[in-house]
């Protein structure tokens, strides 16, 4: 139940199913508790790793914990009864690795359940497929599968994909930065609606913007300082390894007239990115 000391942004009338309970899941749980009205007895967390503090943290929050992996073979049988149990409309929060975002979205659409995730994730094995070429193993290719689904099946129950920090919140920040830039340049303009893609593109062109570079500053600090000449990964271990096996990718604007020697263009989709023949 939401704490009245915090603003409550909405009510979830049905069950809530959170898939994955790593660092992002553990950080998201308190936010759901603070900012949504819901029946905590109808919330469940699914994660294959009960060891450590996972199960205990869920128990301390009064949330049911299921120790099981969501796989290509079991996801429909596992998730459907959990998301449709009882009255109201359920809500699926996918914060896991190795679970196909696209398949989960399709399932949620079938059973009329809103869905949100932080990245377009494939099923286990995608990043280690030695038979796949570099183009099909890119994040661009993964995102295009969702874009194609939208084109084929518009409308339906809301699904919000890639809504983490980056990608996600950075898109909102870029819009505000563009508005600030236009004001600083003394331009006469009307701020486009949030979903007016063409309007934002025209404003970007009018302001003379050709490239957007987003730099992230990691402010995490460990109790024991990192020794010199060492590398510590403060991100997802699974994510770091899997993305390290993918080709390097770059967003590539329509104004670009050249590309690196080892760069390749995509043959399908919006073609807004290129990839390098190297990690």
Language model features with spans:
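Glycine-rich adenosine-cofactor-binding loop
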Residues: 12-30
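NAD(P)-binding Rossmann-fold cofactor-contacting core
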Residues: 37-57
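Conserved Rossmann-fold cofactor-binding substructure of NAD(P)-dependent oxidoreductases
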Residues: 70-84
């Amino acid at each position: 139940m939401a704490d009245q000391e915090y603003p409550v942004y909405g009510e979830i009338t049905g069950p809530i199913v959170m898939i994955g309970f790593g660092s992002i899941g553990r950080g998201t749980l308190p936010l759901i508790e603070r900012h949504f009205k819901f029946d905590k007895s109808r919330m469940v967390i699914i994660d294959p790793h009960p060891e450590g503090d996972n199960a205990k943290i869920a128990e301390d929050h009064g949330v049911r914990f299921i120790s099981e992996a969501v796989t290509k073979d079991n996801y429909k049988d596992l998730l459907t009864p959990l998301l449709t149990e009882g009255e109201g409309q359920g809500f699926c929060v996918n914060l896991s690795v190795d679970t196909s975002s696209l398949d989960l979205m399709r399932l949620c659409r079938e059973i009329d359940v809103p869905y949100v995730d932080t990245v377009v994730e494939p099923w286990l094995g995608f990043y280690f497929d030695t038979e796949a070429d570099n183009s099909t193993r890119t994040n661009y290719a993964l995102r295009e599968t969702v874009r194609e689904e939208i084109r084929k099946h518009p409308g339906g129950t809301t699904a919000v994909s890639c809504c983490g920090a980056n990608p996600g919140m950075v898109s909102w920040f870029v819009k505000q930065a563009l508005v600030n830039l236009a004001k600083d340049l003394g331009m006469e303009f009307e701020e486009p609606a949030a979903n007016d893609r063409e309007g934002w593109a025209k404003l970007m062109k009018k302001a003379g913007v050709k490239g957007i570079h987003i730099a992230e500053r990691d402010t995490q600090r460990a109790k024991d300082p990192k020794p010199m000449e060492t590398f510590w990964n403060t991100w997802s271990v699974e994510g770091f390894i899997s993305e390290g096996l993918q080709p390097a990718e770059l967003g590539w604007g329509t104004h670009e007239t050249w590309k690196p020697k080892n760069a390749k263009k995509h043959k399908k989709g919006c073609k807004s990115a290129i990839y390098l023949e190297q990690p």
